[in-house]
Amino acid sequence: MTLTVTILGCGSSGGVPRVGMGWGACDPAEPRNRRRRCSILVEKRREARDAATTVLVDTSPDLREQLLDSDVRHLDAVLFTHEHADHTHGIDDLRPLVLTMRRCIDVYLDERTSAQVRTRFGYCFITPPGSDYPPILVEHRLTSGREVHIDGPGGTLAALPFRMVHGNIDALGFRFGGLAYASDVSAMPEEAKALLRGLDVLIIDALRYTPHPSHFSLAEALALIDELGPRRAVLTNLHTDLDYATLRRQVPAHVEPAYDGMTITTYD
């Protein structure tokens, strides 16, 4: 069985280019510098041409275009890393899929993220008084270190959430077989590191060159990559400081910047 992960977005919270600020150090002539907000699509298949079990991680504000570009016709589940706007505010763009599939979508959140998302988007879970819109989501709880299993046409996909420090809150990363996704992290606890040994691919936050209170800098990301020793590493959550071609030249051969639409194949 194989896993295919598509980078739907690899930009920082404002994307690249940023409204009112432009491209920064990024060359606008390089298509891989145009970055939507962070999200990935995970697909598990028994064989290459089989139907897939399909899981989305986060609903970015760019979700509509992300799903259209990847021709997503169904989802078996959505996993959320944390409650920040750049990871949740596209949630209503799941509604057309619910109408097409004729069923609600299973969403997985930790307790804090659930409370925040329900405050902002409660109508997605329960029809509010006076509304004719039915709910579109069915909630399930995520707990760090406790694997969840998502069934779909490609078989059961296992997702292992792990807790990370993200500035003054916690966020979740996920391990899917030989791949781990850690998009928003400023410190990686030892218990999480223990779950990230022996990876084929690590997708890791590397916001900018200089330190940031809520995200890894490039140097911090490279240090963790060196410590964990994945076969391959992909840098995501990239700010306007980080030009694709320049960054590609600066990192080791087994490390590369993400770009929107990038696909990664690994094992389940």
Protein language model features and the residues they cover:
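Active-site-proximal loop/helix segments of hydrolase catalytic cores
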Residues: 168-172, 176-202
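Binuclear metal-dependent hydrolase catalytic cores
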Residues: 1-182, 248-267
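Catalytic metal-binding/acid-base residues of hydrolase active sites
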Residues: 62, 84, 186, 207, ...
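Thr-Gly-centered strand-to-loop micro-motif
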Residues: 161-162, 182-184, 204-205, 235-236
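Binuclear metal-ion centers of metallo-dependent hydrolases, dominated by the metallo-beta-lactamase
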Residues: 145, 189-268
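A conditional alpha-helix N-cap/helix-loop micro-motif detector
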Residues: 33, 60, 185, 211-218
